[in-house]
C-alpha cells in the first residue's frame, strides 16, 4: 500500500453519509454537522430512508439513488447487521473508500466476526478500501473533510490529516 491509496480518505470530491440524521443525539447527525461546520467543499449526500432532507441537504433513500456516477467515499453509521448490504450497494456504485464507524463486528465474538468477514470479502472483490469497523474515522483540517462523529472544535486550517482506529488519539488532538 502506498500513500496515494489513502488519498480518498482525506481528499474526496464527494461523500455519502449512510445513517445521516436530523436527531442531534445520533452519530449520523454529528458527521454531517462536522462536514458542514468545517465547510467541506465537496458534495455531501446524506443517506437515510426516513428523511427527505437532513440538515438542509437533500437526503437519499440509498446509495444507489445518489446522482453521481461514482462516489469517492461512504461513511457508514448504522446497525452492524445492515453493513454488508450497504457494502454491496457501494460495490455497485463504484465507491472507492468506505469508513465503517459501526461497531459490533469481531470485537463482539463469533457472529460479529462472521459479519466482518462478509464485509471484507465484498470490499476485496470490489476493490474498495476500508477504514474500520468501529472507528472514529478520518479528519483533514486543510479541506474540512471528516468522517468522525466526535465534535470537531473550530481550528485553524493547516496541513494536518489524521486517521485513527481508536477515539482516544483523535480526542487528544481535539482537546490540545
Which residues does each predicted region cover?
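A short, basic/flexible loop-to-alpha-helix module at the beginning of a structural domain
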Residues: 1-9, 144-153
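Glycine-rich adenosine-cofactor-binding loop
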Residues: 13-31, 161-166
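NAD(P)-binding Rossmann-fold cofactor-contacting core
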Residues: 25, 34-54
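General beta-strand structural signal in soluble alpha/beta enzymes
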Residues: 45-47, 98-100, 124, 129-134, ...
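Rossmann-fold NAD(P) dinucleotide-binding segment
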Residues: 63-68, 81-103
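N-terminal Rossmann-like NAD(P) cofactor-binding module of classical short-chain dehydrogenase/reductase
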Residues: 75
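Rossmann-fold NAD(P)-binding glycine/threonine-rich loop
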Residues: 104-126
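Conserved small/polar residues in nucleotide/adenosyl-binding loops
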Residues: 173-176
Amino acid at each position: 500500500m502506498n500513500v496515494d491509496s489513502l488519498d480518498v480518505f482525506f481528499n474526496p470530491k464527494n461523500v455519502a453519509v449512510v445513517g445521516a440524521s436530523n436527531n442531534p443525539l445520533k452519530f449520523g447527525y454529528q458527521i454531517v454537522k462536522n462536514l458542514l461546520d468545517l465547510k467541506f467543499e465537496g458534495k455531501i449526500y446524506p443517506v437515510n430512508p426516513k428523511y427527505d432532507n437532513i440538515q438542509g441537504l437533500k437526503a437519499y433513500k440509498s446509495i444507489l439513488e445518489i446522482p453521481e456516477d461514482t462516489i469517492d467515499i461512504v461513511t457508514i453509521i448504522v446497525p452492524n447487521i445492515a453493513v454488508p448490504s450497504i457494502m454491496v450497494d457501494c460495490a455497485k456504485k463504484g465507491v472507492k473508500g468506505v469508513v465503517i464507524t459501526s461497531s459490533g463486528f469481531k470485537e463482539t465474538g463469533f457472529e460479529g466476526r462472521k459479519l466482518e468477514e462478509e464485509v471484507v470479502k465484498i470490499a476485496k472483490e470490489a476493490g474498495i478500501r476500508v477504514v474500520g469497523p468501529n472507528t472514529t474515522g478520518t479528519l483533514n483540517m486543510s479541506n474540512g473533510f471528516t468522517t468522525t462523529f466526535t465534535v470537531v472544535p473550530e481550528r485553524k486550517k493547516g496541513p494536518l490529516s489524521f486517521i485513527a482506529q481508536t477515539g482516544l488519539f483523535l480526542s487528544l488532538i481535539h482537546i490540545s
